[in-house]
Amino acid sequence: SIYDKRIHHTDIFSTILGAANIEEPESIKIDGENLLPFILTNKKGQPHETLYWKNSTYQAIIHNDWKLMRSEEPVKQEFLYDLKKDPYEQNNLVSIALDTKDLLNKMLDKHVESMPKPTWPQSVLMPVPVDKPNTEEFNEGDELIYWPN
């Protein structure tokens, strides 16, 4: 069958634990959700009302059908998409849907503030082309995000 709700790669670990009938350790915070109740018993709702991503320079949130991405490298930039109307993220609404942008920024700020600080500093900050395979040559004007490692 097909499960059409949004999930996150962090759900895999929790789902494996659930399939093995192993309780999640209380001493470790696990962000993922066990997907088995949603898949096997048709549990109502969805595993995540909101999804977050964060690294040192790039952060994103999906809430309801809106996605906000923001990056600080090489320059500060924001992207806002209505995923219901624009699933391929072609129309950046960041300068139009200001109330939604403000709400998602506040939610993302709160989430980022709740995260533990990195244990080790990043060693590399490399440019990655947006919507272009790494096998294609970089052209002046190509859109980039910077990915830390």
Question: Positions of the model-derived regions?
Answer:
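Polar, surface-exposed loop/tail segments
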Residues: S1-I61, W120-L125
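A generic structural signal for short coil/turn motifs at secondary-structure boundaries
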Residues: S1-I2, Q90-N92
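Short beta-strand micro-motifs enriched in acidic
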Residues: M69-E73
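Intrinsically disordered, low-complexity polar regions and short flexible loop motifs
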Residues: D86
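Long, internal low-complexity/basic segments
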Residues: I12, V75-K76, L83, N91-N149
